[in-house]
Amino acid sequence: MASEMNASPEYTGYRLEVFIAVFTPLTIIAVALRFYARSLTSKKIDSGDWLIIAALVGQIVAGGIAIGAVKQAGVGHHAAYLAETNPETLVAFFKYLVAMSTWYATTEGLAKLAVCILYKRLFPQRGIHMVINTTMLVLVGASVGGGLADLFGCTPFSAHWGTAEEQAAHCIDTEALFVWGSFPNIVTDVVLLVLPMPIVWGLHASVRLRLVLVLTFLFGSIFGELIGGDSGLITSVLRFIAFYNKSSFIDPTFHAVELIIWTVCEPGVYLIAACLLVYRPLLEKIGIPLVGGVSSRGGNRQEPTELAFQKPSRPRNGAVIKSIGSGSISESGFEYIGDDDQRPLRRQGGITATTNVEVTWAAGSAV
């Protein structure tokens, strides 16, 4: 069978093989560097790290399915050629199509869930948490719904690899599912991109620091794989365009090369982007500090190791801060301003108490 298939004109399956051979090691290296960066700090493995591991397993399995589709299911050859030389290969192709589409739907959101968990740790504001939780629900719902639709979209199940007439009669509109299945990814990508920007830019910090932080989140959200390819948002859009412009069922084995590349690339880019966001300790170890230090209003400078955007902590037992800078003041006439109320508290005597919330750096730890 291999010799017959290799004789096909315009064979393009090798492109998919080369892509998998290059891209899969990149994801493995990215995850390995993430955990090495974590080992440089006192941080323990958390739920976000386990999601990254699961996403990497999903990426490796997807690469295996893609290679199997090339070797056993005729991907890269024209369907007409396969119909003449080896019709059974087309049946194998549609079986691989079910496996690939179901696996993609159920695993592509894992790395983005890890990013959501990271954002929840960085941004403690209640409103931000509501947006993040909603985004996570959308991701989980899209994964479960998409996976079930891909897997059980045909009744009987064997209609998945039946003739075109059988698929039309017994299956949902699978092509529309493939096209619009990426749309929730685009929406959640935009949310994760926009979410940190107002908070970061509103910090009482230098313009340089704010620019560095904005670029950090920007690289993780849009240019997450700047050194190796496209970005999470860009790959979602390009995958959507590819599926929209190229029918999955017109010369499917030939068009599958490009479509599978985007299907493997998209979650892999999310995975690399999620890893890039926590490389700060690694970059500092090799002499590439992202920020030289942060100066607070009190004049203290600390080397940043973990970025957090925290609410002011409530003093215990109603205690109040009795000193500002090097001087001291009486606690008379001052009250604690709640986390959700940042308005100045005006008391008798013309005293105004305000709280400035700035970047907090936790020494000896990393995101």
From Swiss-Prot:
<keyword id="KW-0472">Membrane</keyword>
<feature type="transmembrane region" description="Helical">
    <location>
        <begin position="16"/>
        <end position="36"/>
    </location>
</feature>
<keyword id="KW-0812">Transmembrane</keyword>
<feature type="glycosylation site" description="N-linked (GlcNAc...) asparagine">
    <location>
        <position position="133"/>
    </location>
</feature>
<comment type="function">
    <text>Part of the gene cluster that mediates the biosynthesis of (2Z,4E,6E,10E)-9-hydroxydodeca-2,4,6,10-tetraenoic acid (BAA), (2E,4E,6E,10E)-9-hydroxydodeca-2,4,6,10-tetraenoic acid (BAB), and (2Z,4E,6E)-octa-2,4,6-trienedioic acid (PBA). The highly reducing polyketide synthase Ba17a is sufficent to produce PBA and BAA. The still to be characterized protein Ba17b leads to an increased production of BAA as well as to the production of the new compound BAB.</text>
</comment>
<dbReference type="InterPro" id="IPR052337">
    <property type="entry name" value="SAT4-like"/>
</dbReference>
<feature type="transmembrane region" description="Helical">
    <location>
        <begin position="211"/>
        <end position="231"/>
    </location>
</feature>
<keyword id="KW-1133">Transmembrane helix</keyword>
<protein>
    <recommendedName>
        <fullName>Polyenoic acids biosynthesis gene cluster protein Ba17b</fullName>
    </recommendedName>
</protein>
<dbReference type="InterPro" id="IPR049326">
    <property type="entry name" value="Rhodopsin_dom_fungi"/>
</dbReference>
<comment type="similarity">
    <text>Belongs to the SAT4 family.</text>
</comment>
<feature type="transmembrane region" description="Helical">
    <location>
        <begin position="90"/>
        <end position="110"/>
    </location>
</feature>
<feature type="transmembrane region" description="Helical">
    <location>
        <begin position="259"/>
        <end position="279"/>
    </location>
</feature>
<keyword id="KW-0325">Glycoprotein</keyword>
<dbReference type="GO" id="GO:0016020">
    <property type="term" value="C:membrane"/>
</dbReference>
<comment type="pathway">
    <text>Secondary metabolite biosynthesis.</text>
</comment>
<dbReference type="Pfam" id="PF20684">
    <property type="entry name" value="Fung_rhodopsin"/>
</dbReference>
<feature type="transmembrane region" description="Helical">
    <location>
        <begin position="50"/>
        <end position="70"/>
    </location>
</feature>
<feature type="transmembrane region" description="Helical">
    <location>
        <begin position="137"/>
        <end position="157"/>
    </location>
</feature>
<feature type="transmembrane region" description="Helical">
    <location>
        <begin position="183"/>
        <end position="203"/>
    </location>
</feature>
<feature type="glycosylation site" description="N-linked (GlcNAc...) asparagine">
    <location>
        <position position="245"/>
    </location>
</feature>
